[in-house]
Amino acid sequence: MQLSLRLSAIAGLVTRGNRLVDVGCDHGYLPVSLYLDGKIPGAIAMDVRKGPLSRAQEHISQYGLDAYIETRLSDGLEALKPGEGDTLVIAGMGGPLMERILTDGAEVRESFREMILQPQSDIPHFRRFVRKIGWQITEEEMVLEDGKFYPMNIGRAHV
């Protein structure tokens, strides 16, 4: 499966062997690609909208991965329990929305080993928020795709 440059960069930041949670999964390409590459043992792909989640489920089924990648209709982290994943990916959303997701899902957020975050707006404020909640940005990437820069951060708690 060929990922966009942005999604390839995100995939490269995921720690091998971690169970992935992809919030705002859209088409589900990221967890499918990571599983097919043998980088993750499984994933939970979540989206707030039925249409994108349905497309994700179609792609998951197309590759025969229903036993490894689960889909959930969810507003942020609300359909997730603590400990269900190791790596959280939230990408392609505005910083304020990502902040709301991480604030509303604080209990679940604290159960992750790492968060890969790719805010589309309000980046300086979002970086301060990540530090404020006790996470440290330990790695950063920047990708230029279709004339737009996409910053990506890896956050780890208690570093």
Describe each PLM feature range.
Residues 2-17:
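Conserved alpha-helix/loop element of class I SAM-dependent methyltransferases that forms part
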Residues 17-26:
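Conserved class I S-adenosyl-L-methionine
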Residues 28, 32:
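Glycine-rich SAM-binding Motif I of class I
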Residues 42-47:
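Conserved SAM-binding motif I beta-strand of class I
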Residues 49-51:
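Conserved SAM/SAH-binding beta-strand->alpha-helix loop
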Residues 54-83:
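S-adenosyl-L-methionine
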Residues 104-153:
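C-terminal substrate-binding/active-site "lid" region of AdoMet-derived donor-dependent transferases
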Residues 157-159:
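Conserved small/polar residues in nucleotide/adenosyl-binding loops
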